[in-house]
Amino acid sequence: MEDMPLSFSCSDCQRHFPNLPELARHRELRHSSAKQDGEEADGIPHPYGSHPENLANHQRNHETLFFPCTTCGKDFSNRLALQSHMRTHAPESHRRHGPPHAMETAPHLGSETMATDSWGQRLGSGEGWENQTKLVRETHDWESGADPRAASGTWEDPPTKQRQGLEMQPDSKGGTADWVPAVSSEGASPLPTPASNLLSNLEQYLAESVVNFTEAQEPTEPLPTEGERKYRCSECGKTYKHAGSLTNHRQSHTLGIYPCSICFKEFSNLMALKNHSRLHAQYRPYHCPHCPRAFRLPRDLLEHQQSHEGLKQEQPWEDKEMPTTNGHADERSWGQLSKTGMLNGSGELSSSGQLEDGGSEEYRPFCCGDCGRTYRHAGSLINHRKSHQTGIYPCSICSKQLFNAAALKNHIRAHHRPRQGAGEGGQSSVSSTALTSAENTPKVDEVPTASLDHRPYKCNECGRAYRHRGSLVNHRHSHRTGEYQCSLCPRKYPNLMALRNHVRVHCKATRRSTDPGTEGSPSPVKKEQHDPVGMEAAFHGDEEHACKREEEATSNPSMADRTVPQVCSICGMLFEDLKSLEHHSVTHREGEKSRTDSTVSPTRTFACQDCGKSYRHSGSLINHRQTHQTGDFSCGACAKHFHTMAAMKSHLRRHSRQWNRRRQKQDSGTGEVATLPPGGAWTLKLENDEDPDSSQDPLGESPCETEDNLERDGDCLQAGSRGNECVLKREEACFLGDKEGTEEGLEEREACFLDDLGTPGDECNETGFCGGLPGMDSDRKRGICHSDSSSHPADADTVWKAAATHTCSDCGDSFSHAAGLLSHRSCHPPGIYQCSLCPKEFDSLPALRSHFQTHRPGEVASAQPFLCCLCGMIFPGRTGYRRHLRQAHGASAMTEGSEEEEEGTAETASTHSPPLQLSEAELLNQLQREVEALDGAGYGHICGCCGQTYDDLGSLERHHQSQSSSNRTENVPSHLEGAGDATEMVADHGFEGTVTSVSEEGGDIKSEEGVGGTVADSLCMQAGESFLESHPRPFQCNQCGKTYRHGGSLVNHRKIHQTGDFICPVCSRCYPNLAAYRNHLRNHPRCKGSEPQMGPISEAGGCSEPQNAAEAGQEQAVIGQLQEELKVEPLEELAGVKEEVWEGTAVKEEELEQELETGCQTEVTSERPFSCEVCGRTYKHAGSLINHRQSHQTGHFGCQACSKGFSNLMSLKNHRRIHADPRQFRCSECGKAFRLRKQLANHQRVHAERRRSRGTQKLTREDRPFRCGQCGRTYRHAGSLMNHQCNPEASRYSCPFCFKTYSNRTALKDHQRVHSDSQQRRQSGCPQRAAAVRCTLCGCGFSGQGSLEQHLQEHEDTKLEVASGQGGQHATEGSEENLDDWGLEGRSDGTEVLQVEHETKRPGGHSQSPSSPACSGGTESTQQVGKVDGSQGDRGQMNHNGAWVLQDQLTKPEGKLEDTVSRNPCHLSESQSNGPTLRYRDSWKGADSGSQLQPESHCCSQCGKAYCQPDGLLNPSINGKDCHICLLCSKEFLNPVTTEIHNHTTAQRFACSNCSKVCESHSELATHMKTHAVEHSQMSGQMEKTRGPQAGMAEVGPPGPGKAQEAPSELPGDPEENGVPANGGQGIHFPAAEDKERPFCCAQCGRSYRHAGSLLNHQKAHTIGLYPCSLCPKLLPNLLSLKNHSRTHTDPKRYSCNICGKAFRTAARLQGHGRVHAPQEGPFTCSHCPRRFRHRISFLRHQQQHQEEWPVSSSGASVAPAASREDSSTASLPNPSPQWPADLSLSL
């Protein structure tokens, strides 16, 4: 029989068509004047001159202009193509205006392309044209099919075939249902359609219009090769055979927003909009007989009909013939018939053509186990299973999130692979015979278009409805919620399936970045792999590629007709013969055998205490624990940071693979043969097995040597430590197995990859990499493992080099654009790279690589490093390691015999250690071994049960034997198979007795795999699991009873008990224990390397660090006494406080997250080789130094989330965690959320202490075990007792403001912050923080009720002291009279009354209170009464260098009035308020009221002011000759800061309307206006009521017996006349000693800060101008005000009113709002109106409204109206004085 012609030519226009139906349809539409007999088409070309219209149409093809479509914007190269395209947009009514063609009789052909399956070829999975377009991309048109001319027996002469079709055509009533069997009868096998019929007729027009082939250019070969893909996309490099395909593809790059004109849905490119517009096609010919819905495709109708109940009992079609819909043969029926013919090997079709009930299941054998959906092909089922891979799948291009893998795959096609399907031109492929039969078919009545809102599939849980069942199945996965975190990165997923899918992303990360230019000519290896038998024998790939091979097998006509395909009942793969199927089934039997063997393996006995995940081996559990080791881990090579240890390990592997890829590129570029490194087994992927259609790498790399092969698709070919352990895993096995098998597959693949990185080369050199692959001959291995650069075409290499012209000098990566290179350079920050073989350091990786060349292959370090598992230090030799253990940890129990045996074991282990490689991979492997401890030679060996560490295997074995012998009777040993040896598992219940000598790990215990076969991984773990279940925190402190999970945590905790007076010699700070001192060294690098002046106390029963030799005898006595007390304390009392943490070790939690240093301090600097050149701080690792250097990169670094500024990168990085890390730990009592669990635990202690404080005011003896031997006071912690210890230096630290003494300088500095912060707030005009409760006596605010009660107790003590001090025998007046003068009355109902009486100056030159003695004792007692406040500092007392003195102690000239004001002790520190100071009480009681100034008083020679301390005279800030005078206004100031603040250059914007004073800011003006308001209210109050003979005496008190309110008053006078500034002494500067602690000083105002960030924040206050708010039209005077104002818009309003629901940002505003709803009651009643007020400030403001109605007498005394008798008990207003405090608003 003759060969099949390549195509069918039209005799009129010389156009070519792939089959007869296309030709017949073309002649019917274009050449209606020609003969209609299809059998006379002889294929003889006719000239264009025979038909003038054809010649005119043909000439349009040569027009080279661009013709855009006005509807969709698509461009065409000629007018004919545009006209053909415009028919797709024309409505159906417009298409029928012409002569009655076949379109009228078959209207459904206008917009729906008939499937070519009716011609005997079923493509893809039988899903219509969409799946056919998918097959175009996957099989590359003709590549996957065989030569059409090869099947000589399947083709007949075309005219003969046409005649047969016409002769067998039935009448019009039969429709097309009976016509197809005539074509596909037994006598004539079905016509196999070439792959080119996938392109529609319109695309054929486009292809010929863009490129005009001449006769010499037309392809003559039947099979186009890869070289004919000459149409390349300029943006992404994708190539196509036809220009129309390229034009279609370019629409995917037209990015933008393209809304649908019907449903207004937006799309990112034109291709997506075009595909979507097909859903809105008006012509839906397929109607459902049960509901009014209609569909475009028959398969959609068939799927819809399955949703109706009772579908099987009904017969939707009237006739029993093959079901037809509007003249179309149902696609599913044709697919089933063709499938049947393919499986049975016969072309017979059912004569009845009925759609049986079970026909769907009969011809759809592949069923989904999850949803029950069935398919005809195994590949369709594999593709469908991806829809069940639920999770969150973000698109890497547009960041859209999809919820299953199938949706993501379809979504990515919209970006990169636009569908080149038919139906684009709206033309149907049908023969002339079909059209003729369709003309005789009666026209089907049109049914109204169905409603688009019909959603039959409804979710039972949430009620959401869907149109398709698959959408409902995908939606149901969203209800399976949970929290599954990836072990390699910090990402979390809502279900386990999403987590498994995410793990694959780590394995195939490079698949997304595959270079599109790597396509070339297929290699001989690939041609060899096209055989399914060879592929299955060599390697069983994932099911996606198996689907491709199956489609290739089914698309081969000769193979389908020659033999019956054999289907595997397990995986659904197809094979051409029974022999291939039997060969394939062997793999399943081996898998079943391996699963059977795995079921015999021991149970999962090792469970994680944190997440509950269980493992069979202890090593797997130890590796798994790394996922819970959260923190800030930095890579030493690129300074990248990670949240978990597992993520950093995964990152280190990436460096190793990148280096290998660059090394192989270099080798291939020089023409050398790249061989595998002998140092380890590699995880490689054969590209040929993965993608048969892809080509070799253009740089000459073999498939096993490229980066893509390392990670693509996660198909790991593992070359293990032994050849028989190389296991080939299939990707989809994780989804087909049960849950346990799935977890095992992921764990084994992950663990296999990690373990093989450290596998010695001599264990795998028997077979090498390729030797471990089964089913591969030597030639095949040689072709895979070696490559030759000359085998690649030169043009591909040229294209590669031309595309990548920009090369990175550091890593060698190439980029096509300069922008890509610039963005890539940020990945190579300057850092320190240390050689793993010598201590040399380099600035970049290229320098380190060149240095590696200097080391020889056999060069090894002098000795294997020894890692201390207690502190993490590494020692080069055993001697230094043992010396460190004896000195630092006290571990000296090793015997000489054990040492010798240990050395011999170490030497034996070192001989089997892998040789060092001359590559960067060895550096990374060394880093991995330090972190993971994969190689056990020379490292500590950790018992998996008890955590005890041994530095040799012999000691570990003896440990197991000793425990086994002592506990053999209690435990039954179980045998495990580990490396071929059975090992006994023993228990360890004698663990508590050896806790002290346990070598605790620092939380990083690792597995010791591959070291030897004598000790298995699961030693001591089965019985240890039961112990861990009963003791989840096995490491217990023997002093306080606190328990920990890890030994390293216990080691760090024990430093708290190493108490002592640790004084830093650099900054003179004192710390009570070693932990606090070490934390201080971290924060202050300048102090690092210095030893504390006083040695620490050795912990009882534990290890201690080296003592300082020089210790005082008295200090040793105190330390010994404390140690004895610690030993005497019973364990029960210590266990009661095990959860308490010493209150002095306040370590910043963010710094603990940043760096967890557990290393011991030692003088050996060589073990910390990385030193900072700025501050001298040293580190063990280069990554730590790189991380530290960020703290020196000072500048202005702003947070993008909250606009907060920072002074260095480290602060900004730590701050970003606040925004990034979720606050998942929430307090159940108050609802506050925290990022860390320990933060929540510390917060919950506050609630617990508050609950305890409500029940008992003081803790019991059991809760406070540490007692002072001198005074009997008890404490919770030893550090608090050490601070309390009374020593001779206890009184040398005194506060210059309030004369309070402290035992150490740290406590004094903490106390001085109370004074400095209040003064700084008053200087800057910033309002004070709102307090929760306030004292009614002095107005001080407190954060809690407990602080207020302590403060009121101080008032009570002060009252008693004053009463006892005035009861002396030398008092000038009686005690009762003095008590009345002072106004100190008894406390009633928690309220005290304090009245102040003023005396005029006495003739002696001293103004003396009638009750206060003029001696130092009286001064000291007055200090206990007085209050340090800047607002009251300008009355009664003077502040000289922080020393407050009374006016009776100051020598002033005659004629000046001075006043005296006493103050209450509101300034006392809460930390020191547990007990009063008895020293000054005694001096108060023993004071002589008649005595004058004592000799110890120090008077100023210029002004006569007296001081209690001599340093008060040395303060130059108040010296007369050092006064600072303004040159413009001659005003004097005490210090340069106040002078600098006072300036005349500020714009006159904020001026007071009363006194014309100019203020610098609006807040300062508002503060100033309050002074005027208070002055007026004082005057009105003074004129309202007076009591007693003195007009200056006033009392304000609440109504009712025994209640009153005090208000300080004084005589009017100018404060500057007394030498005190108007701001109340705010300009007083601190001594220079404190300047060292506040090194950051503002250049404009001189204000100093401890941190650079505080200075940066303060400098915003000086940026004066008009700063508009971006959210509201408000203008702010400076940046600081703008920042504070922006919080009103951004901060959430957490505090809501329970009555009206209004929300506020702060609790203080909510409290103020609550007064609106509260009844108008209070102690202050207005005498002119019935209003009452709770607070004095509100009452004074209200009185200001009445002041204009009051007459003022000529003498200045106000005449107040008479008050009613009921108001006589109300409080009187204070004496009018211009010195009323400006911040009276705080005295509520």
From Swiss-Prot:
According to the UniProt record, where is the region Disordered? 28-48, 139-196, 306-360, 416-449, 509-531, 651-712, 889-916, 956-976, 1351-1386, 1398-1439, 1455-1489, 1579-1629, 1744-1788
Q: Which UniProt keywords apply?
A: Isopeptide bond, Metal-binding, Phosphoprotein, Repeat, Ubl conjugation, Zinc, Zinc-finger
Q: Compositional bias (Basic residues) at which positions? A: 651-664
> Locations of Acidic residues compositional bias?
1374-1383
One GO term (biological process): regulation of DNA-templated transcription
Tell me which domain of life the UniProt entry assigns to the organism this sequence originates from.
Eukaryota
The residue ranges flagged as biased composition, category Polar residues, are 427-440, 962-972, 1406-1425
Q: Which SUPFAM superfamilies match?
A: beta-beta-alpha zinc fingers
Q: Which residues carry this modification: Phosphoserine?
A: 601
> Which residue numbers mark the cross-link Glycyl lysine isopeptide (Lys-Gly) (interchain with G-Cter in SUMO2) in this sequence?
443, 526, 548, 1127, 1138, 1148
User: Per the record, a Pfam family?
Assistant: zf-C2H2_6
Q: Which residues form the signal peptide?
A: none
The record places its C2H2-type zinc fingers at 8-31, 67-89, 231-253, 258-280, 286-308, 366-389, 393-415, 457-479, 484-506, 606-628, 633-655, 806-828, 833-855, 866-889, 1035-1057, 1062-1084, 1170-1192, 1197-1219, 1225-1247, 1266-1285, 1293-1315, 1333-1355, 1550-1572, 1640-1662, 1667-1689, 1695-1717, 1724-1746
InterPro entries per the UniProt record, alphabetical: Znf_C2H2_sf, Znf_C2H2_type
Which Gene Ontology molecular-function terms are recorded?
A: zinc ion binding
Q: Per the record, where are the segments of Basic and acidic residues compositional bias?
A: 28-38, 306-333, 1351-1360
**Which stretches does UniProt call biased (Low complexity)?**
345-357, 1751-1763
According to its UniProt record, which protein family does this protein belong to? Answer: Belongs to the krueppel C2H2-type zinc-finger protein family.
- General function of this protein: May be involved in transcriptional regulation.
Its protein name is Zinc finger protein 646
Q: Which organism is it from?
A: Mus musculus
